[in-house]
Amino acid sequence: MKTILVEFKTSLLITLVFAVLLCGAYPLAVWAGGQLFFRQKANGSLVMDPDGTVRGSALLAQNFSSDRYFHPRPSAAGTGFDASSSNATNLGPTSDKLANGIHAKDAAGRDVDDLNNFDGIKDLVKAYRAENGLGADESVPADAVTRSASGLDPDISVQNATLQAARVARARKLPVVQVEALVASHVQDRDLRIFGQPRVNVLLLNLALDQESAGR
């Protein structure tokens, strides 16, 4: 009986110690480290107006669809850009749905709105070329027509942003060189100069674009 009590006491003590460490000390240390060294990122990388109005997060894509703005990558998060439903298409490279999409038709063979409709890469390439005034044989950046693994990638490639500059400039009646210069000023280098590719944050670029237009 004494042996059982000793073992129970030891087990209880170990449980309490690890509960304090793993449920208290460790989370507190991680939180404190985040607040001390990565305060902006730890708090969601929120982007705010001078008056404190939150415009979004620099870590999450938003669905900019107007010609006056740069567009993010396509999204498969929920019905698109749903931060509560981060997701990829999970379609393989040989998938016919990924390449050609799915489009519901009516009795006359015309496209109709349907929850199961899905734009394939060929559809997205065609739409991208049309909205940006590109030729039928002009190369389209891969990130412009593919959905990211999270569906919420906030960045686009420099080539993607550059190809959209003429459309944005035309919609805002700004010189193309002015918009291209704004893109160039928002290019972020590779992480640690070796990981990933140079990129442009769409939300930050679009907010700077609004400020540029307002200052004319």
Give names to the regions the model predicted.
Residues 1-9:
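Cytosolic juxtamembrane amphipathic/interface segments immediately preceding
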Residues 168-216:
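Non-catalytic, structured segments within soluble enzyme domains
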Residues 6, 14, 23, 28-30, ...:
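Flexible, solvent-exposed loop/hinge segments and secondary-structure transition points
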